[in-house]
Amino acid sequence: MNIDIVISADHIDEKGLINKTVIIIDILRATSVITTAINNGCKKVIPVLTVEEAKDIAKNSEEDIILGGERNALKIDGFNFSNSPLEYTKKYVEGKTVVLSTTNGTRAINNSFNAKTILISALINSKATAKAIDKLHEDLIIINSGTNGQFSIDDFICSGYLIDCLYNIRKDLELSDIAKTAHYIYTNNKDIESFVKKATHYSRLKSLNLEKDLEYCFQKDIIDVVPQYKDGYIIKSNI
């Protein structure tokens, strides 16, 4: 199995994704939100690029819609929820559709539509993601959503942890140089939050008093669910 990493949503080569399995990572916080919502019984998540698109879907849909997302880490005016995974509890999302628009994560998803399979991962479900990947027997591209088109330490070290989880299942991994680097960084910094504390995006969230979000997002493997993008929606994968 060949594994490569893309460092941000802006670095995605859409043609290069054809017939590939893609893993989208945005641990702070979009993929943590999606994984949490699906785990709490959300019917589906619709990832969109713009605020206007999200509001149009909510206006024209007959389904029970929750609008969620952020711009510059802040809740969007007129939306039900921000990009905090702690808001997407079973009480509020069970049986409902979440329309999500974020600065980085939903853009990475929308830029990956050429892929054969798109799975959603974060620290909170990395082991479950690794098990699903193992069943697919396909080359893998891990896409880090990044921060405003730039490299993001938090997504990168999460990629390293996901690779480590895969190594615990199978040994026939062929890593690109960047994938080797991510794995090396993780294996030498297994206390991920401590390593990430000086990162730009981490500091931004902390400045907004989102310490509880950070604490939640840096937990490993508290969820055994893998969301999958399919036919316009993100649902619970049956892989």
Swiss-Prot record:
Kindly state which keywords UniProt assigns to this record, in alphabetical order. Answer: Hydrolase, Magnesium
Domain of life of the native organism:
Bacteria
Q: What is its EC number?
A: 3.1.3.71
One Gene Ontology molecular-function label: sulfopyruvate decarboxylase activity
Task: Check the record and name the InterPro entries matching this protein.
Answer: ComB-like (IPR005238), ComB-like_sf (IPR036702)
| Catalytic activity reported | (2R)-O-phospho-3-sulfolactate + H2O = (2R)-3-sulfolactate + phosphate
Name one matching Pfam family: 2-ph_phosp
Q: Which cofactor does it need?
A: Mg(2+)
EC category:
hydrolase
Family, as annotated: Belongs to the ComB family.
Task: Please give the name of this protein.
Answer: Probable 2-phosphosulfolactate phosphatase
- What gene is this protein a product of? comB
